[in-house]
Amino acid sequence: ICFWDFQNQEGLMMRQFEAEQIATEMLLDCANVKLYNFYDKYDIICNLDNYRDREHYAPEINSKILQWIQAGDGLITRDNYMSKLEQEKELYLNYDYDSIYQANVEQ
């Protein structure tokens, strides 16, 4: 979530969403690529305890991601990529970024 907070503070959100859409469309054209997106795992993303630094998850979260990939969870397809990107955009454009820092101060 700190990554998205940085994008928001720097005015880079829309550029990030556009880049993600372009990259997704290009990768979906590759027959030998499977693309996964876990930006909708809000309980993980929005909890700072799940990170080892500003952008990287703790090892146990990385293990969960590997389990999701093995199970096929989060697979992006031509049929679902636009709705996933729109859902992602909706959350991150409207997220209360101040709340993540307040929650950690109160603990």
Regions picked out by a protein language model, each given a short descriptive name:
Residues 20-48:
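Extracellular serine-dependent O-acyl
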Residues 1-30:
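Conserved, well-ordered alpha-helix/loop/beta-strand core segments that scaffold catalytic motifs
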Residues 49-96:
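Histidine-centered active-site loop/cap adjacent to the catalytic His
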Residues 8-10, 47-50:
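Histidine/acidic-residue-rich catalytic or RNA/ligand-binding cores of hydrolases
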